[in-house]
């Protein structure tokens, strides 16, 4: 196995029993691939596939004018590179996007041409079509400076669906069957039975009409309709009675209404006897072709065809007429012998279409179409053209109706056709096929569809959603272009005059900015980012709504297996509607979710991996991943647990066709990070996977000692870590940047052989957490492509590290851990284990007001010297200043209107020249409850306005940093070039050169070292080829310098041009504060098993329970939190964590006493290779073994993969290895080594019972008490009721509600109650009166009339009831 640079430093011991057969795919692939197919930016315009933008353009173009003499054709499109990079867009509040230009061709035809159209003129031009936001490499979008994610949508696939109402509609409980044809866009077509078994159809959920109207409208006559849906009985009229053609299966089960005889007149079935199989056999044996029936047997039957008198041509009876005695007489009169009737019965051949035809009053095709027109457009007069146009537009027009590739495939599969391609509009036979299946269902044949089956729901990804929006914009443009195309020739217009890109831009902007599926990215930690991008929502436009979604849609379905996680979903109203993709899930070309399986042939598991969709999976028998497999791949168990068509069963190995690729296949990323997930109750696992996404990154991330082995994948795929693009040697490292000299074999010719990585330092995330990258390589390290070079937020040596490993004791402690409260040692706070940095962004804008411009300045009257001391000459706070609530960050004054002055004031003004009072201080201050350190300031100035010193200084610093980067690149490029030169020149013969180099001298190394490098180019070589090489190297260095100068100029131009600010804004200043949040009582914490709680007390270290060797616990949890919640995984994690730490301590002790490398190797082999997945420690050098051991001192990290984790024996073995008997005795451990004797920190006495102690990875969640704590004395009041506003954001008060009033009433505290309901709430005069009284030192409350009472009086008056108060 190949170890990466960082993996070698700290190997995670895995307890997995099964080899890795299939690597976890790149976790953001769905988003990135979808958007790249939408753009097809890297494909040449001629080779683009008809999808994404290309498909949208080709579906709308060509646009033809109303008169048909001008048309606008689409040629190709191109995307220009974005003007600003991602970081610049975030700083400036811009959208990271690219301008879209389309090359279109205006073709004008000759109106005079008599026969066929002749092209008169062609104009081709590139037209700007708006901006398309671009996806960042991590799968998000930067819209107006904030990162957003477009969530994929799970919607009902286009196609045809059959269902019944489960007997809920009608009181009898009868099943009413219905069918629905859903196109990708266009009108929905529904068919449904009513309780009387008449079949109706409706378009777009409008009024229902008999289905035969639709069949007539598509051109079928009543005869053809009946022929399509029924089989016929043939009768020949005889002078007495009639003869019926004998069809055996139609008679079985019927009761004979007369004696049935064979040809010779022998009675085979007597009257009133039920016809059974023996009777049929006898009739068959007698070779019966016809059966004689009495005449009344015909009465009540329904004619299948029109009966016409052969001589006169008169229609005697119509198709679908019942045969009556009158009809029979007419038939005999006209000497008609042969008639056909419909064969129906009550069991499997109902007369539904016949009875529908009977209530249908339309006569022919036109009448049927008029009826449909009247239903769609009530009140409009049906002219023939309008009727035809509407009907054709409903299902037959490609503009208005699109089944899509998926819809056609699903439709054809459902109606049993073999080919999966076909026209994208509805065809007549599609409608017929649907009705036939629906009638079959009513007849009891076939099954209805399961709507929640993942074969009937598909995923719409970013690319597809964006394409739909873009198409909608283009369609709006098309309407406008059509209008103007008529004037194109007369007014000599060019394509850009015809096309206005506004509708496209606004459609795209609206989608990315405010669609329900475009969400503000959850960026608390790397896991929350990845999960957000892998989310699949059933809500959104064209999806479900929370209120309408029933229980079935939200429930776990068997087809979710390996596609959608059954665990991770939000609690609350969205449960089950928002899901997460499973680890290995992937979308196929139709948008259906697929999951990988290993192929099994003749009960042998092969390495072939097939991706199966939910429908395909139903056809196979699939074994679980934990089935026992021998070395040669054969399945060894007699019976193997497997799944077939959604059912779990035990089958013999020879029946198995596929096998799961991994046990973690069924869960999502977040759930697969929970160790011992298999021992947790599902509800708690749900909470655990949701709470990991809320973990705040700690100051010093610490890897989980007990993990699942997927931590590295998550950290790397999330993009928070820095990965090497190319391998090479680390040339330079500091906290902000790394320079890597690329390997020769990876460097492209003519390219700079150097990669510079600028790290993200103390940047604010969307959730105000801190994103900061730290290098984990040192100069001289050799790295390969894909190695982790720097850790980001919540990552430790390239692994996800959401919390800290805490020494946990499960025991009650003086009621401080009652009801999930958490007791924490002061040492945890002192060591800054859970300290996190939060970055707040505060903005101030200087606008142009009616009274003059606002000004950002230091010159503010009556501001204390302490406050002014923090501001520079421009009035902006210094970086590094420590600020508290209320401190000024940016000084700003706003002009205010002239006030009328008294003569005295005028005099004073005249004497002192006091002019300061006509501006008011509107400075940016630190909000209440916040304090921190200023870490960054950004100043944006409108174009054409003088920059202040601070703004100029910020630009200069930025340019300085950029120059440093370029110099580094140049230094390495030149170094590299001169090394090659030295190798080339040494030993060559010279014709002369600097320092009087004689002709014919061989050049030596010493001579070159003595010369300045740039003078090497002055050496004249005898060998012409070498001389040419020397020139080439000189040119390439010059060229590189020129390139770098150009790049620098470009950067300077970008920085010095004015900033785009909203209208009316002259200047904007952003100040970033770093706030340090230490752990404190009231903060919410949780483990990974849904074991959440609130910190109740931080206890001095000396009072915490401690072990025999004096080691105190970090956290004390209540043991009662485990049994009822059934999340036993946390206890197993604690045991294994205890073993992991113990092993680390033993390795630390070996290093301390400088044990031999061989002893270290032996111990490490015992840890890694006794059970679980073996590691190749023999391939490590001695130095690597020592470095590995040093990194393991804090605990050997274990991986216990989901559903394939450590067993009880393995845990016991690890505990025995970590704590040999002598160590265990010193620690006071029980013989089983999973409990310890603890002592009370306050009394020193031993606790009565042993306690479970060990290490658990514990997280601090984003619900911090600092953000929630809030107090108010006076503040804003509501306008109408005059009561204080509510909530922290409004600086509101605490509501003293109904129940609180009852409490005071119960105590009889009438004065308290009075002040609560009056002066402390909405008695306006009383409020001021109280203040006056307090100032006078007179502590009396004069309660008046509450304002809300006045509101009540006004409301009663508005009802017309006059109500007055008698004030005495």
Swiss-Prot record:
It catalyses: RNA(n) + a ribonucleoside 5'-triphosphate = RNA(n+1) + diphosphate. CDD domains: RNA_pol_B_RPB2. GO terms for molecular function: DNA binding; DNA-directed RNA polymerase activity; ribonucleoside binding. Its EC number is 2.7.7.6. One of its GO terms (biological process) is DNA-templated transcription. Keywords: DNA-directed RNA polymerase, Nucleotidyltransferase, Transcription, Transferase. Pfam families: RNA_pol_Rpb2_1, RNA_pol_Rpb2_2, RNA_pol_Rpb2_3, RNA_pol_Rpb2_45, RNA_pol_Rpb2_6, RNA_pol_Rpb2_7. Gene3D superfamilies: 2.40.50.100, 2.40.50.150, 3.90.1100.10, DNA-directed RNA polymerase, beta subunit, external 1 domain, DNA-directed RNA polymerase, subunit 2, domain 6, RNA polymerase alpha subunit dimerisation domain, RNA polymerase Rpb2, domain 2. NCBIfam families: PRK00405.1 (NF001616), rpoB (TIGR02013). Belongs to the RNA polymerase beta chain family. This is DNA-directed RNA polymerase subunit beta. The gene is rpoB.
